[in-house]
Amino acid sequence: MIEFWRSEYTRILSICPDPGKKYRNKNVRMWSLYLERVREVIWKTKQEFKAEYSFPKTSLAANKVDDVSPKFVMEVMDVFVENLNVLMKINDPCLWLFVPGHMKEQIEQVLKELKLLRFFVCFVSSKCIEPQYRRTTFYTHALIEASHNAMVVWLHLPVYGNKNQDLAPTEVSRLLSDFMEMKIKSIQPGNSIYIDVLQALKSTIPQAQQKHAAESGIVEIPIHSLTVGLSDQMANLQEMICLLRDNLIHLPILDLEFHLQDMDSVILDAGLLIYSFYDIKGEKEDTMLEDINRALGFDLPRNIEPIKAMVYLVMQKAFQCNLPRVHGLGYVDFLLKNLKDFQGRYSDSLAFLKNQLQVIQTEFESLQPFLKVVAEEPHNKLKTLNEDCATQIIRKSYEDIIEEITCIKAKIQEKNTVEDTMKTVIARTSSQLARTLRMNEEIVGFEDVIEKLRNRLLNRTKGQDVISIHGMPGLGKTTLANRLYSDMSVVSQFDICARCCVSQVYSYKDLLLSLIRDAIGENSDQHRELIRDAIGENSDQHRELCANELADKLRKTLLRRRYLILVDDVWENSVWDDLRGWFPDANNRSRIILMTRHHEVAKYASVHGDPLHLRMLDEDESWKLLEKKVFGEQSCSSPLLKNVGLRIAKMCGQLPLSIVLVAGILSEMEKEVECWEQVANNLGSHIHNDSRAIVDQSYHVLPCHLKSCFLYFGAFLEDRVIDISRLIGLWISESFIKSCEGRRLEYIAEGYLENLIGRNLVMVTQRAISDGKVKACRLHDVLLDFCKKRAAEENFLLWINRDQSTKAVYSHKQHAHLAFTEMDNLVEWSASCSLVGSVLFKSYDPYFRPLSSHAFAISHILLNFKFLKVLDLEHQVIIDFIPTELFYLRYLSAHIDQNSIPSSISNLWNLETLILKSRSASKHNRVLLPSTVWDMVKLRHLHIPYFSTEDEEALLENSAKLYDLETLSSPYFSRVEDAELMLRRTPNLRKLICEVQCLESPHQYHVLNFPIRLEILKLYNRSKAFKTIPFCISAPNLKYLKLSRFYLDSQYLSETADHLKHLEVLKLSCVEFGDHGEWEVSNGMFPQLKILKLEYVSLMKWIVADDVFPNLEQLVLRGCRHLMEIPSCFMDILSLKYIKVDEYSESVVQSARKIQETQIEEYQNNNFKLVIIKVHYREKLNELFSLLSLTVLGLVLHPIFL
């Protein structure tokens, strides 16, 4: 048989074509014939082996192996495991090594056996010091047993050739049954071999200092043997070993160090007992395990009890440490939510406990109002009582819990005489959820400074000028600069406005891309392509643009343009030396505003004038700022209240940040003298010297449900703008948001955020133009530093830094959340932090992904975090595989290295948010989503670019629906039928982003019914050519619609408008208008439209009826160079507030100015604003020619550019 295989292999190689040449048809046919012949030979060979082979019949004496070194044995096992893993990854049924799903589970069992056996060999080779012959016998036994593993699998594999079937299921079951039955005592005399080795290991326990059995996988071997071979005997032994297996690897090993030898002894005694039992039971069937225990003199039951007590103690300690100490009320909220989920999930199996669990739930609920009083009272004794509520419950079994809660409640009621002084500062939650902060930041006392800066920005000095502002943290440097940066009288004088924030830790690439994004437009095709170039996605070699190349692109963009650059938080002169070369001086009155805390840096950077030192507020200005923040446009009418307010403002040390924070406290209180006096007394006379004390006071008066939300900001980096949708998603996954009947969690979370904004703890950086909702925010450095430190003190959040020693990490208690910035940090310290509930990666370089060299290590390290609920890797860390064993995950965000999602993703049945990005995904290479995703019924947000379903036929057959799914992006459709099918499966969608290519439909303008709750729809055409949309969009509650790269005409938009009566925002980007570039808007179209944005549309003639757009507030035109004019009917739209024109024709500007004149003079609309962005046509033309030269790299430009 071997000779036959050798000859066949030689013949196949002889016809194998040169890999550098194309296959010839003849060779291809010969190749196919020989493959068929090989399949047939394999099948016949299996039949011969099957007739002769039986696992139990083979004896150790009949197998002689020359090399029985442990290294050789482990290498052979590694080859077996590797080959089996390859087989398990073959998912294409067309391949002849494809393993059907029902057989994979059996092969996984064989894999487990091999891995366990390999560990046993490794452990014995490193620990056993007994005579060599004992180990040689053991290694020989292990090698042959591994070979039997491989043989069973090989006979198990199907072979599809000449219609020959693989082994029948009954035959496979017989082989596996033989294998499973004999694997414990295995090859005779296997039992005596195991007993000899375990006795040898036991004798080395006092000498084994490096690695103990208790902390290693050796504990898996006896428990695995028990699960196969034992029935109900010595259940206590089984419970003990299960406890060790499931928990020891997650517990801090330093807490166990004084018990390791005892635990080793118990584990090895258990193994000796089990294998001795099998050895004797083979001779006497009625032998009991207890008899063997006495015969060996182990007395395992007595030895087990103290170990169990110790392990439970360590488990309790670790679990208590894992609970955050932010607020005691959160303990009960946490326990109540999990108790309800637990009862709902296991309602059938817990029927016998139903009454007890319901009583426990009732008692918990009754504790909440008492604990709220305790949580608000800072007295240490009450705080201890509060924490005891959770820690005492952990120790009790369910029979004792009810009695214990009753006792705790009684203790709390005894302390319910706490003074009511601080109750006035408790937030009125119902009103806070609806509150919205005024959009503009208040500036008081710097009118003279603002005017001076404005004059320097707009003076006639031709050369570049750097205007430096310096001052201590909290003075308002950034607020002041932002006011000028958003002042249209200033901004309109510059061609380009851009900004960046340096801070102490920064990345040149990050700063450059931030500036380029502002300079060329964040949503422009040019910016998107630049990002792809920067991260290497547009290069065959995946070469990233270096910082010098990006700096060159920035210089070319700024050259010959008049620009305004804002550079915030510069710490050293050397930093400015590195940055200044990015900004060319073309003698065109360009300006740079630089902000720093240090006078030396400000003086060093200034060019034509002295740096501006931002002074402190005087007493009168301090009171005015406090009054504005508390009373808004009104004033304080009470002289007594004003006197207290003046005293509080003075106590804040004339620092704007301190005043704003205290105003946040006062704004939530009753405007009574007694309440304000209480605040003044709590602040103390020392407050002006300690900004943290003011923040601490603001934190102290926060309602319990906001404290965790506020401290969670500590997981973000300094000077980073935080995306609100991402933040709210994390809050919800962390269970910070308390559910309220009939209200979406997102709405409640938005109320939480507005509350923090209203207290001046969070700064708004961007609001949605349509509805004013917050889209982005950030924290002041002082507040962020407080969050990081307080979160660490409260066991809430731990930052792992590159210079932190392992000893320091081990000394920490377990924290609820773990944040890190370097992949190596997570790998090195994962063992000491394995009980955390969240792992958050924060990159200093948000545009770039780290190298994927750690992908495999990171993926396996993540499996150590068994209780993980949130895994947020920010698309930065590439993982080798999705950790589908982390069953508690609710939030997963990562970058993957493959274009298919495994079907086992459905194992993450708790998952609510899934954000994945494949490094190679594109319109030509889509991500395949398995049909099992429809089993993930808790999924609420799914974000995977360019994904399509793996098996559309299976999707048709599967009637499951994702009722909770609210956000979906970005499915890729090529047929309208596919889109309809997807929409039927997601009936409650609220936001949908679609990628389509060459959409086909049997009916032109077929009405496609979108989910009734859909509010946001973005539709992108990814075909090279502009295509029509073969369906009308019907979505009765749609508020936001964006269409990009489509061919539209008046008829289509008119018919679609009939189905979109509640549309508020319409954006058309890179759209071709039919009818010779004409768009006719008739009466009744888009009656609720508030924002209309047209970008790079080939619109020449725009005909608008008189009564169209009755509610329009904003009109934005960009790149509409062929448009002749803005229709005159816009003059009579009374709701119009804003028109912006960018890259325009002169006739459009003239019509815009006429509209402005009419709005202001005739209708007295003094709030109307007209913004005209200047454009230099020569530079723009050069830029377009440069863009045209990049088409070979995949850029697709709009036809109006050509």
From Swiss-Prot:
InterPro entries: Apaf_helical, Disease_R_plants, LRR_dom_sf, NB-ARC, P-loop_NTPase, R1A-like_N, RX-like_CC, WH-like_DNA-bd_sf. It is a peripheral membrane protein. This is Putative late blight resistance protein homolog R1B-8. LRR repeats lie at residues 865-889, 908-936, 1011-1036, 1040-1059, 1060-1084, 1086-1111, 1128-1151. Keywords: ATP-binding, Coiled coil, Cytoplasm, Hypersensitive response, Leucine-rich repeat, Membrane, Nucleotide-binding, Plant defense, Repeat. GO terms for biological process: plant-type hypersensitive response. It is found in: Cytoplasm; Membrane. The gene is R1B-8.
